[in-house]
Amino acid sequence: LRPYLTQMGEYENLYYAAPNLYCIVKTIYYTEAGQVNEGHLRMLGKAFTLFGLGATGIAMIFFHRKKFPVNEKNLISTAYFFALFVPFVLPYMHERYFLLSDIFAVLFVFSYPKKSYIGVATMYASLRAIAQNPFHSDFDNKLYMGLVVLAAIVCLAGVLKKEIFLRETPQTPRSLPLSGSENE
């Protein structure tokens, strides 16, 4: 956490080719002259840093307290959610911070074939962001790619809700009856 907080002052832009929340926010804050009010964006950056850290902390506490079945699919979807959510809401992120979410997206596609559009969408947005560097091209659809990742996060939250929180967990009885003692 400390390296992230010290690097916040080193960078001026709220995002560096990463398809995150600031692609969307920066588009909203354009003025009529085409200039961006950087002071407002920096304040938003600090606010979203607190929001991102707080939301992640609350979600981690909720996951810790919620009794849900621990299996490979649940672990993959939960890890994928956090690997995608954290660089999406934190400011000053480069596109390379989405690499972990790309890895979990591949695992998610194989674990949930019917929901593979979520993983494909995030990998596409990440690839579009990464592809600008070797070809020295401008990432022209930053807003749209940010919206694609936002939609993927919402869909992934729906998968988590369905798979983890709405699924009935088997109830263990408080005490097991001894054989034959119940009938006597």
Q: Language-model segments: which ranges?
A:
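Aromatic/glycine/proline-enriched transmembrane-helix motif characteristic
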Residues: 7-89, 163-165
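Active-site lining segments that contact anionic ligands and/or coordinate catalytic metals
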Residues: 73, 95, 119
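Membrane-embedded alpha-helical segments of multi-pass membrane proteins
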Residues: 50-52, 97-105, 143-151
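Generic hydrophobic alpha-helical segments
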Residues: 28, 107-108, 131
